[in-house]
């Protein structure tokens, strides 16, 4: 299910890249070049050079970009549904390379070095594509229909979860995001160019928050840090995973305006859906963790079978996790 979901998001990416706007030079100036502004030279210079290089033939180049994303999505969906681990590995490896190039040459490192806000997508949706892909990488299988994801629930997954949410909270403490009215301005800007009902929703939210001081973004930063720490250290992990999903949906609606996909100029759904996917990956990892390391929804649990050597519960949980990861 998780691999199919990741593939579906890639397919949406590809479909959005086929929008008419993406075949014009406005895509080059308003998306590629704009994303590089304010970044260090190692981001700015190659991005500007690439933009000028592809601008004369942007229609051809954009068709290639969109096709790559569709192929990645199709490879993930087909590989997951037909239980083809080798196809999944090849597709995921290609997606990692593509994601790095997009993050560097098209997203300006997701605004990580320019005061970008995690409420509008920083540190970049493609970072989450890579994280999800690594966690769902199929390990050695013992049968044709088995495609385990050994990294789910492991220390690397928990460490990555903590690092992402802690860094997101740190970004919110940057001066640009601590200015008076910063949160209100971010929401109002997200609603610009959106259809009437979305614009009205975001305009109302922005008006409600107008004039708020840095306490609002500081509070969100603390929530992000708490989510990262709690899940990483098994403190009511499921409760905090639910909280992360609620926050991700809020970010997607109010900070990202559904990734601007309703404007005809959105290149991807942005980070909101991928944060939800990451949370579901972590949830699946909890379901498949060894019994002695499991935690209940109310706190750390104790499994007597861990002392007696019984493995039936672990095997059943691992089978459930494997099915969910497909």
Model-derived features: where do they sit?
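Extended, low-polarity transmembrane helix blocks
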Residues: 1-326
């Amino acid at each position: 299910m998780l691999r199919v979901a990741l593939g579906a998001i890639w397919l949406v990416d590809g479909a959005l890249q086929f929008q008419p706007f993406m075949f014009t030079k406005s895509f080059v100036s308003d998306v590629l070049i704009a994303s590089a502004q304010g970044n260090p030279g190692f981001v700015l210079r190659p991005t500007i050079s690439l933009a000028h290089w592809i601008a004369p033939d942007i229609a051809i180049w954009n068709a290639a970009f969109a096709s790559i994303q569709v192929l990645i999505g199709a490879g993930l969906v087909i590989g997951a549904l037909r239980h083809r681990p080798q196809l999944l590995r090849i597709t995921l490896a290609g997606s990692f390379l593509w994601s790095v190039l997009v993050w560097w040459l098209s997203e300006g490192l997701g605004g990580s070095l320019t005061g970008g806000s995690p409420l509008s997508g920083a540190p970049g949706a493609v970072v989450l594509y890579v994280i999800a892909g690594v966690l769902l990488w199929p390990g050695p299988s013992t049968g044709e229909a088995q495609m385990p994801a050994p990294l789910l629930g492991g220390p690397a997954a928990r460490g990555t979860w903590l690092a992402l949410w802690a860094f997101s909270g740190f970004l919110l403490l940057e001066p640009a995001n601590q200015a008076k009215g910063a949160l209100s301005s971010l929401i109002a800007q997200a609603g610009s160019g959106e259809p009437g009902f979305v614009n009205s929703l975001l305009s109302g939210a922005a008006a409600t928050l107008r004039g708020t001081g840095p306490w609002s973004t500081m509070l969100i930063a603390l929530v992000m840090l708490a989510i990262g720490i709690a899940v990483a250290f098994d403190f009511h992990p499921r409760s905090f995973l639910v909280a992360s999903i609620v926050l991700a949906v809020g970010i997607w609606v109010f900070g990202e305006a559904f990734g601007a996909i309703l404007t005809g100029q959105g290149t991807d759904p942005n980070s909101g859906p991928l944060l939800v996917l990451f949370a579901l990956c972590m949830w699946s990892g909890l379901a498949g963790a060894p019994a002695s390391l499991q935690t209940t929804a109310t706190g750390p649990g104790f499994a007597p079978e861990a002392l007696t050597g019984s493995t039936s519960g672990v095997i059943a949980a691992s089978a459930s996790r494997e099915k969910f990861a497909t």
